[in-house]
């Protein structure tokens, strides 16, 4: 198989596997009567992220449980989509949803083939550190390293360090995306992981489309805005160097679409909307901790547009707690201390002081 044919095959595989839970959520909501495109896209993104974090915890419980969960998520999504009878759903809304789906696939293909236009598919993760930028640290490999450990070992032992990084230092959502698709075919070179990483990073396109629809821009303006963002330095560098910043952006953008949309006055009194909003914010934090810098002003904007009810706030708090508490417990109990990035960014302190562990290379690190 030629390099380009292999890339195309992997691209289609990971687009389909990533999109299945999202498509099921959107079609089910449409069948139940929801017609708002921004809300349907927000639901789709939330379903995608929730499937990934569910897979992460299933693998952590036991690798066999994780693999069963991965197959059930994929096959269950296919069955659910069939049962939704898309041919009987609102064609006009389906056409509106097809546009961001097509742009997501197009954006993924653009980054993948631009990244490998000069070859390098035999060592993709190293290529990604220099392809569009000055040499970057190997942070793009961290989720792959820990995903392999959980895939083989679950919670049976504490994962070994990657360089100086503990498994608790970075949120687990991208690890979860890897684990959902690992059983369907993988490799040792990292090419599967790289293509999947690009596909997941490009979910920002769906989130941004939701924002542009909520802002009631015309289709031409939406297309121009998305195209400009796709070819920007941020879109290309962070799209190919697959650390999970753009995944987090997708969820924050979807939450923003809820706040700025014309339905906010109704949504701020709906517990279901509270659960969706909190899930998007929680998934953003489980993708990248820097999401807090977007979520805090987003909460201020939501309050300015109309304070939610106490019931809404309570529902949101419970959903956020359900998503974030297990990871916080893991950080504190399974692989402490879990706060090294905060100490580093605020206090300039990175060393692990209270334990000695062995890195994958076998050298002792303090």
Please identify what each model-predicted range represents:
Residues 1-117:
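Membrane-embedded, hydrophobic transmembrane alpha-helices
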Residues 52-56, 312-366:
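Membrane-lumen/periplasm interface segments of specific transmembrane helices
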Residues 237-248:
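Short acidic/glycine- and proline-prone juxtamembrane loop motifs at membrane-interface regions
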